[in-house]
Each structure stands twice: as C-alpha cells, then as structure tokens.
Amino acid sequence: MKHYLALVFALFAFCFAWGSNPYINCVYEYCPAPGQFVNTMPVATEEDTPATMAAKADSAIANHKQEMISLGGYGGYVVFGFDHKILNIEGAYDFKILGNSFYANANPSQTTRRGGSSEPGIVMVSCDDNHNGLPDDTWYELAGSEYYKPATRHNYTMTYYRTPFDHQATPNNEYPFLCDTTYIAWSSSTGEKGYMPKNTFHKQDYFPLWMGDSISFTGTIMANNGVDESSTGSYYVSYCFDWGYVDDQPNELPNEPEMHASEFKIDWAVDADGHPVHLDGIQFVKVYTAINQYNGWLGECSTEILDAFDLHPGATSLEENSMDGEGRKKIFRNGTLLILRGANTYDILGHIINKHN
C-alpha cells in the first residue's frame, strides 16, 4: 500500500520531550584521504585504529559539539547517523550539514559565480532497512547541481600511496611554500597519475597514520572549481556550485533565505545508475570530498564538517490506512492524537498546521 507523509511542526520542546536528538547521534566511520589537516583534525597517532578514529570524530561533531573534522583530498569520507529517521517531507529541505565555506570579498567573478573558499563534499544517504541500527544498507547519492553535467565522472576510483621512508623531497624553488611536490603519489581508474604536494604550513604526516600503505576511494568526482585569479599563485578563488553539496556555500545567508544554504532534500536521492528513487526517510549520511585539486598555498581541496541536524525533528510518518470512522487520516504518538487530516489541525499554541478545505 502506498505510504504518505504528514508533518507535525511542533515546538522544539516537543522534540526533546520525546527524546529525539536533531543532531548527529553517532559517527560510525571516519576515513579521510591524505591532506594537510589530516592527523590533526582530529588528532591521530600511530596507535590509533579505525574504531578509535571514528570515536574521535564522534567526539568532535556528534551531539552539536561543532569541532571541525577534515576529510582530506578526493574521496575522504565520514559516515554518521541520527537516533531517529529523518523524514522526507515533500517540498521541504530535510537536513542541514555545516562546513566552513565562505565568500571572498575580492572575488573577480562575483557577478557571475560566487566564490571564495568552496570545498564541496558529495552527500549520500541510507535507510536502516534491515533494522539493525548500522549503516550497512544501500547507499544513495543526493544528485546536486553537477550530477548530470558532462564534466562530472561517476564510478571513479582514486588510490593514494604512503610516502616511502627513504623518499627524497622535491621542493619548488619558484614557490618556496611547496616543500615537497612529489610527496604523496596517487593514481586513478582512468589512468591519471599525480602527487599531493606538502607545504611548509603543515609539517605533520598527511597520510592517515592508522591506515595501510595505500587507500582507494570510489565515487563521483566533479570538475575543479579553484582558479588562480592572480596568475602568480598568490590568490586562489574556489567557486561555488549551485546547490547540493557540503562545505560549498556558507552555512548561513540571512539576506538570501531562498538559497537554503547548506540544506539538503532527500528527494534528490538517485540509485547507482542515476535514476531518482523515493525514500520516505533516512537515518545515515555519508559525506566525501568531491574534487581532486591542489590550490597553491591554500593546499588541497578538502571538505570540512562542523555539524549536521534534522530540519524537522518533530515530523512523524503517516500511513494511508490510519483512518478514523469518517475517513480522516489520523496519527498517534504514545497514545496521543497528534494530527487529523481531513480537518483543521493545530499545534499546542493553537497555530494552524493543516487547513482542511
């Protein structure tokens, strides 16, 4: 039987009374690609393991802690979840993920494309279909503004290789901030090869200390968005994409609420072949860095994450067969009638939620 969703926009007090936490409840996996902030955000040691690093990432961003984590270069990811299903509300934005993107004041192309520091991350979502509370079900990508564009490549694999102990650094004499231009080698499934340089601003090991000698990531990769506007390597602008990515637009645009900055719709979900799918809700989110680009003294494009939360934590699902004797749709929670469709519906302050015509 086809399912429908009804929405109760109750007060935040309602949400907490029910024990629902709108913020990240748990980080299940933290697997960054190499990068200049890796092993420092959060701090890692050689004694760490995937489990201890997931716990450190959890301590940083779960439960509204808002301590930044870095995903490193292309493919680096984090998997987190919520203590409830985030419902797919038709026509609404369902959840928000915060990064540290900002617009540049001296942006030469501000009139045609906004930019500054944009390090976009792709979002994937999953339901708890097997009801085991773990993110081990099918993943769906949220198809942002670049998903169907020719420059975007899907099923792309990139592998990074740990730098050998006997490696000899290759500095760049023209750009002294680049102390090693052949630091971490990488290769791709399309035959590309290159290096992630090391800079003088971040001198720790860029390769995740708790990983093996190589790491591979597979996913969607987007076109580079960084431009050396100075042509001398002194001023880079990374331009924003239109919508659908983490750490791409600023977290808040108070003068432009229509932009829905850093907000996401579950309705954007597509399957592995790019076909739209309908999900009535999701419980798990995966974010990974979407671009492989090195922007001079700014370093690699690396998605950062600060926080994430449900935009309508008081929403409750409704099935079509929940009817009263007069054919009106009803929903209960803990034995209390919350919404009655087919009649006017009000919240606890008397404000109308749904008007029956």
Predicted regions: what they are:
Residues M1-S20, T316-E319, G350, N354-N357:
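Bacterial Sec-dependent N-terminal signal peptides
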Residues I122-M124, N344:
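Beta-strand signatures of extracellular beta-sandwich domains
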Residues L142-A143, H356:
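Short hydrophobic alpha-helix segments
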Residues H312-G342, I352-I353:
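Residue-level detector of functionally pivotal "anchor" positions at catalytic/ligand-binding pockets or at interdomain
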Residues S126-N132:
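Short loop/turn segments immediately following beta-strands, especially the blade-tip
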Residues W18-G121, A143-A315:
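A domain-level signal for the mature, folded cores of soluble proteins
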Residues G133-L142:
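Tryptophan-centered short beta-strand motifs
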